[in-house]
Design a protein with these regions (language model features):
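Intrinsically disordered, low-complexity terminal regions
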Residues: 1-222
Length: 222
């Protein structure tokens, strides 16, 4: 009887495995789609775009030049691309952070980012979003928009090596901390920037720049 039960349990476990496994999707140039409400493993492509539909769950998402688009309520761990853009709708969760080299990053109301948001030359924008880490870039613009909360700080690194030659002549990055936004950590600028902080915003210590206050819905143009 004991051996029969063991065999039965083994059969049931093997039968359940395919249903429990999360599917990995990989392509070179084709686009990938994570269907609404479904769970996936890793999504990887070189030049194809990746669309994560509403309510779907994906482990890690990686592209080289493709864009990553996340619909409302999508959940992921890590999002990474080299030159593609990452655009998140409302209530996105990225539990292990977000990174690009030259692609732009944006998240809308109700989104939660675990870890850092990082780029070399891409712009980073948040509206009504909470980030448990910080924001780092070299030459990209940063907007911590209305109602956003960044627990870490903001760091603009000094260009060096080949990156310094490529971006050394660009205009200073534009950093905007919008209405009712909070940046708990230090704001450290290793190169010149244009820093605008709304009168209702709360920020940590600033080094390397002088903040310009504004009380209009949007920051002044440079």
């Amino acid at each position: 009887m004991k051996s029969t039960r063991s065999a039965l349990f083994l059969t049931l476990a093997l039968a359940a495995t395919p249903a429990l496994a999360q599917q990995n999707l990989n392509t070179i140039s084709d686009d990938l789609v994570a269907r609404a409400g479904q769970a996936y493993g890793n999504l990887d492509t070189v030049s194809g775009d990746i669309a994560i539909q509403a309510g779907s769950s994906v482990r890690n998402v990686n592209t080289v030049s493709g864009d990553i688009d996340l619909a409302e309520g999508a959940t992921t761990a890590r999002l990474e691309t080299v030159s593609g853009d990452i655009e998140g709708g409302r209530k996105i969760t990225a539990s292990a952070g977000v990174g690009t080299v030259s692609g732009d990053i944006f998240f809308d109301h109700g989104s939660r980012i675990g870890g850092d948001l990082e780029s070399v030359s891409g712009d980073i924008g948040l509206v009504g979003t909470r980030a448990s880490g910080g924001i780092e870039t070299v030459s990209g613009d940063i907007t911590v928009g209305a109602g956003s909360h960044v627990k870490g700080g903001i760091r603009i690194e000094k260009p060096n090596g080949s990156w310094g030659l490529r971006i050394g002549n660009r205009k200073p990055p534009r950093i905007v901390i919008g209405p009712n936004a909070v940046v708990e950590g230090a704001l450290v600028f290793e190169r010149p920037v244009a820093l605008y902080v709304h009168s209702s915003a709360k920020i940590g210590r600033v080094s390397g720049a002088t903040a310009r206050s504004f009380d209009t819905p949007t920051a002044p143009k440079d």
